[in-house]
Amino acid sequence: MPKRAADEPGTSTTDPFHEQSPFDAVLAGTETTDTICEEPPAKRIDLDIKQEFNGGVQSGGLIKNESELTQMTIKQETEGNINEARREEEDEEQDEDSRTSMPPALGEDDDYEEDDADSFIDKTNTPPPSQSFLEGCRAANLPNDIVTGAWETYNHAVQRVSLEGSESAWQLSAIYYYLLSKGIKRRGKTIRILIQPFPVSILTIANSFDISVAEMLDKTARFVEIIHSRKIRRYQEYIRRIQEGLAVSCVIFKKFCRIFCKIFEEIKVGSENCPSSHELFTVLWTSFLVMKSRMTVDDLISNYQLLFSILDQVYTEMCSMKEGIVHHLNQKFVEDLLENDCTIIRALCTQFGGSVLDARHFSDHTFKKMEKTGIPSTWNFQEFRDLIMNVPKTAYENYLLQRGSIDERIFIPSVEDFSKIFQSPDTYSVADILKVSYSGRRFRDAEFLTKISNNHCLEKLALGGKVASEKLVTQSKEQPRVPCVEYNLELGNYPDDLESNNQSLYNRLTKIIGSWKLENSKLEEVCGTMSDSPMATILLKSDEMTNKFERTLSAELGETINENIPKYHYNVRKELELVFLIFMEKIIVAELKKKVREEDLLNVIRREEFLDSVFCFCVELILVSNGYDRPFPWSAELCGVHPFMFHKVIDLMITHEKQLSRQMVQHFSRIEETVIEYFSWKSDSPLWPMVVRCPFAHFQEFGEDWADKLNSYSPIKFTPIKKPDDLRDELGRPIVPQNQTSRTLRIFLKRTYFTAARRLQDLTDRVSMGARAKSQCWSLFDYLLRNDTLIFMDRHLDQILLCCVFVIMKINESSMLFTEIMAQYRRQSANSLLVYRSVTVFQEQLNPENPQAVNTKETILERLEGPQKEKTTVDIIKYYNIEFRDRIKYIIGQIDSASDEDLMEMPVATESGLMPVRVYLTHKLSIQTLPKTKHGESKQERAIANLEKSGITIAMERSGD
């Protein structure tokens, strides 16, 4: 593979920032001030929002001399950079000022803008960098602080997941991520120039690590998801733009090769007043890249027209010259233009597939008004050869450092291989250059990723056009989509039909049971070593529930219970009994290995609610493995456990049984999602008494970090150490300890946010909602969930989301009807007919003679303890008109007038979601307790202190972790 002309290893576009070795501090174990964050700033506590809401110039003329051009270029480039930097600083100051006055339900945390890559990494046990990492950094001349910070970021990712593939590629992606984290703002408008430019071109670093561009971008995109910081959306958008820009440049470069061979003749060796073909090709392509960087859009058509405009300008000036570069012109091409009396733009559009009218319009109204600094304004090589060659190069290299982009001069072949452009321009492979490293090593997964990308693009072309063109969406226009057949990674085949799928599930169940017997089992052994063996309690529960399961199943099938019970039902009962005992064994053994106190563990095991939940899980496992058509919550009703309490053990069971198949895990994930979206909000749910004691408004915002430590319910936290009967309030009602309640609610709230974010992101994309409208929609949902939680009682999560989408569309003056939004909702995989046809309301609200308005000041406790009112169901449009609209009258005005910085950005829900992650004791993973954050006095604390000085006492609750 020939060497590329651009950016060889060890060549930096700027001088190093220091003279000493950049690895001395790393090897010595010291830390730089730029990468240390001793204590994160205090997080605010959410308040009720109602308490806060009371009141280019074109450069003309030719170059006269070398010094004039140099001074002009440096001055204009410097002034442009300074002005843009000042604008970014002003945006930062406005962001900081707005935080003091923004509504808590709408804004972000009251912390400053931290360096994203430094704010969440535990640096106490970071091992020293590997030798290969240091060698790559040394070859790229990276500053010491970047070497240290990038290695800490890489080590943080290694501790979280197992990184497969080239270690050097992941280390390079960590460097790229760290450099972007220094330059990308978390808030405010999306920037085109980084706050802190790169010290070295990223292509130089990639060549130093011998990694291809395609592999670097692929690994960086995945690295962003692994870290999953608060700025993940900004990172993904930035990398997406870089990838799209490269894709456009690939197409344009291949077209440019054909055009260059058509207009110019090959001159292998240049002279003082006439460059070689390789030099002319390099200057033209670099000039195009400089102008391309100033385009507000980066689509293929606009770049195509930009290329035509540049060639038109160059050709026009060359024709006016008698010596020098004019010798490059292809005489046959010139004669054809003169013979047909045709302009070069018309000729290029005719021969290479462009629109003459669009190209002329772009040239007259866009290109001629663009700033021309950074590209040659004369092509007199005899007088200004060095400047013509260096000015575009310098301008483009400054752009690369300011934006962190890939050097697209990588496509230019070396001098030795340049003759291939003239020999076979159509067969010159551009995309392959991105797949090969500096030494010629090919990216193994490049072809596979290309196929996936092509299929994704074709799907977007097939479906995306309808959303933009069709304003009215009707059910008759929807085309049924054939679902893809899922390849079974565990069995190595495709499921032929439902029967074979059920058979594979049953085989997996048989594998879980194996030859397990109670006699001489670990369960019997461990229980025997306890001071008060729980074996009798477990066996009694097993016998009681299996009998109930058998009776219920037989009664539904119309059979009588006698000695002639079918053998099949008997086998199912035995399977259920064994599965229950196996899971109890795994739970007890695993918890004892964690050094859990025996007293705490016995309290959990003897709790009826816990045993019923575990048995309910086993019933679901038996039903799905044997192909029984008993949709959830049939198993919960059988076991007498509420779905909200049952979903708390799902993570526990999946974590302790590693032999569950993918289909089994997906089945329980769907059940958990059903509980979160509907069953938890029923009026009889245990969730409501917990919310009364610890409202959602007391919890801090999660941002976009779905992967913090509180993702799973702990078995020990399932019950307090003291029995519930021992803790009662003044009215005799049982009190759930605050630490347990807050932990349970925090995990549930996080999962609710994740589910809502995923549904809302899909729905808002389908209705073509803009970025500001999405933030408004998420801000409204967040306010309702935290400050008006009662609106969710007896309702489906999607019902609230649909209403939020409709009202935001209305305040943004959209003409889309509610029925059209419902049509888009029906396209979601998790849609339900009952969502928009059966919304619970009170019967008194529908009284035609005297309809009762909704009481927006009613509390959850008043609803629970008050007299039960008659309920009925209506369609979602009627519900919106009689209740939802009245509940949001106040907040919607604040959201409508709020600035973009005051609105909450919709978080990104990763594909893996909150799926339980199995972590075993054999894993090389160190879990350390972080020191407690020292919070400063918040606004709420200061307000309460002022009230207490006036003689008013207010009790403030904090949510526990």
Swiss-Prot record:
Residues 1-43, 55-129 are annotated as: Disordered. It is found in: Nucleus. CDD domains: CYCLIN_RB-like. Coiled coil: none annotated. One of its GO terms (biological process) is regulation of DNA-templated transcription. SMART domains: DUF3452, RB_A. The modification Phosphoserine is found at residue 714. This is Retinoblastoma-like protein homolog lin-35. It comes from Caenorhabditis elegans. The gene is lin-35.
